[in-house]
Amino acid sequence: KQATCSIPYEYSNGKFKRTLYYSNGVYANS
C-alpha cells in the first residue's frame, strides 16, 4: 500500500513497518 500525504514507510525484514510521522501538529499512524 502507498502512504498518503507525507507518511513514509520503512522497509525492514522484508515487511513494511508502520512509522509514526509528525504532520500538521498531529501524530498520524498510517
UniProtKB/Swiss-Prot annotation:
Kindly provide the name given to this protein in its UniProt entry. Answer: Hainantoxin F7-28.42
Q: Which UniProt keywords apply?
A: Secreted, Toxin
GO annotation, cellular component aspect: extracellular region
UniProt KW Nucleotide-binding keyword: no
Its annotated compartments are: Secreted
The record lists the organism as: Cyriopagopus hainanus
Q: What is its main location?
A: secreted
Tissue expression per record = Expressed by the venom gland.
> Which Gene Ontology molecular-function terms are recorded?
toxin activity
